[in-house]
Amino acid sequence: MGHPKKPRKQYDTPSHPWNADRIKEENRLANKYGLKNKKEIWKAESRVKRYRRDARIILGMDIDERADKEKELLDHLVRAGFISPNAKLEEVLDLNVEDILRRRLQSLVFKRGLSHTAKEARLFVVHGHITLNGKKINAPGHLVEKADEENIDFYPGSSVAKQFETQETEEVAAEEEPKDEE
């Protein structure tokens, strides 16, 4: 079981430390999603491996045992937003790291336009400027379920929210001025 003060690692490190292709891919992902370090990529990889392993185990079961476990896994992945609602179990084997990284709070803040860059989205989350369902979440790696995706917003009274809104209104006003001159 392990010691309560020392929980088990949630990821596996690469088997070989100096693989140029892997390092380039990890750097690309870190830049695209604004990640702090490679550990965040390795955690996502471990999650993908776990889902794919579960799918392979379920595919190998007898049909009568398989139905409940298949429905349970697919419902979990659909609720999390990793696969589409009408996906089959075989499609779970096509999951990749980017599917997991897209569901992080940090990525969704950037995608919804609440920040200019992915790194800025991380900063907003860590500094407590972002809420999810009205609750302040300060973990950029928090995986957001599909149903909660629309409930991401700035914390009420956040100074960043006020600055961001004034910048947006200034940009909209600047875009409208040339249209009036024509």
Swiss-Prot record:
Give me the ranges of the annotated region Disordered.
1-23, 158-182
According to its UniProt entry, this protein's organism is: Methanosphaera stadtmanae (strain ATCC 43021 / DSM 3091 / JCM 11832 / MCB-3)
Protein name as annotated: Small ribosomal subunit protein uS4
Q: What Gene Ontology molecular function terms does this protein carry? A: rRNA binding; structural constituent of ribosome
For this UniProt record, the keywords arranged alphabetically read as follows: Ribonucleoprotein, Ribosomal protein, RNA-binding, rRNA-binding
Matching SUPFAM superfamilies, A to Z? Alpha-L RNA-binding motif (SSF55174)
What lineage does the source organism belong to?
Archaea, Methanobacteriati, Methanobacteriota, Methanomada group, Methanobacteria
| Highest taxon, organism lineage | Archaea
Give an example GO biological process.
translation
Q: Where is the composition biased (Acidic residues)?
A: 167-182
Self-association and partners? Part of the 30S ribosomal subunit. Contacts protein S5. The interaction surface between S4 and S5 is involved in control of translational fidelity.
GO CC list: small ribosomal subunit
Q: Name one Pfam family in it.
A: S4
Gene3D superfamilies membership: RNA-binding S4 domain (3.10.290.10)
Q: Which residues form the S4 RNA-binding domain?
A: 103-170
